[in-house]
């Protein structure tokens, strides 16, 4: 996905297994807003060519139970195991100012305060217990981790596709 334009379809979940014998499926939510499934009416399965009606049935542990239009038995539901559930980009929940979806950040240009290009964000790393890290790849292919905090990230402009960072000495060195 790095370097590509932002996706038109956003993954909100992945089918993990059938639920019961009448075609319902268990879905692992890949969204920060699993409550979105409560009001979900339509979803695309693995791409824009297969849009179906969706009906929320409940939560079980960390999974969502959905009924999908046209899926009426366990065998049909089993064939969906591993399928991505997608929604149009316009249907994602708006975030508060200063918060961004990974798909908005990945691919944007990273510059220093003087406008000198430093690279592009190729990944957002969520493994730090303190804050996210932006993985910035330079033209020669080196990667650097930039903490996603105001001390380093001075500006993110999604319209221009630019992130301004103020790196401390040594942050971008070998």
Curated annotation (Swiss-Prot):
Biological process (GO) annotations? ribosomal small subunit biogenesis; rRNA processing
Q: Which UniProt keywords apply?
A: Chaperone, Cytoplasm, Ribosome biogenesis, rRNA processing
Question: Does Transmembrane helix show up as a keyword for this record?
Answer: no
The compartments listed are:
Cytoplasm
Q: Pinpoint the PRC barrel domain residues.
A: 97-171
A GO cellular component annotated for this chain's UniProt record is:
cytoplasm
**From which residue to which does the signal peptide run?**
none
* Keyword rRNA processing in record: yes
Note the Pfam families from the entry. Answer: PRC_RimM, RimM
Described by its record, this protein's role is as follows: An accessory protein needed during the final step in the assembly of 30S ribosomal subunit, possibly for assembly of the head region. Essential for efficient processing of 16S rRNA. May be needed both before and after RbfA during the maturation of 16S rRNA. It has affinity for free ribosomal 30S subunits but not for 70S ribosomes.
Q: How does it assemble?
A: Binds ribosomal protein uS19.
Tell me the protein's name.
Ribosome maturation factor RimM
Organism encoding this protein: Symbiobacterium thermophilum (strain DSM 24528 / JCM 14929 / IAM 14863 / T)
Organism classification? Bacteria, Bacillati, Bacillota, Clostridia, Eubacteriales
